């Protein structure tokens, strides 16, 4: 299983070797396609995505914030569902709170507000 435990992000640009590597591990666990990953990252150019993946670089503050929220969602789900398969499956289940849509679908709408909405929901479910 990919290691996603070492992500530390802040509002300034950060080297992708830290945040982006953690995001890629998360994307693998959640079985996200390249197009889905690009959506979650805030739709950077495909060339930028592949540059980050190959050579590293710096992510914008918006991208750092997105990755931070996604990692928090992942960690909250691990607390709520100690069995990893159940935590990952939760993303695909439909939830009344999201208008009978899955959290994955809400996340893939691509707006930062939607990522925050999913994060706030899972944080509330775990009592955080």
Q: At which residue positions do the language-model features occur?
A:
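Non-transmembrane "mature" sequence context
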Residues: 1-128
């Amino acid at each position: 299983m990919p290691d996603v435990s070492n992500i530390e992000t802040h509002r300034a640009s950060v080297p992708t070797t830290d945040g982006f590597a953690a995001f890629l591990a998360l994307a693998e666990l959640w079985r996200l396609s390249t197009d889905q990953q690009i959506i979650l990252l805030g739709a950077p150019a495909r060339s930028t995505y592949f540059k980050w993946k190959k050579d590293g670089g710096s992510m914008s503050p918006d991208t750092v914030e997105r990755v931070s929220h996604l990692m928090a969602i992942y960690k909250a789900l691990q607390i709520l569902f100690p069995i990893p398969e159940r935590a990952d499956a939760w993303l695909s289940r439909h939830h009344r709170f999201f208008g009978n849509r899955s959290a994955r679908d809400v996340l893939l709408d691509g707006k930062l507000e939607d990522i925050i909405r999913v994060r706030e929901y899972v944080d509330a479910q775990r009592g955080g």
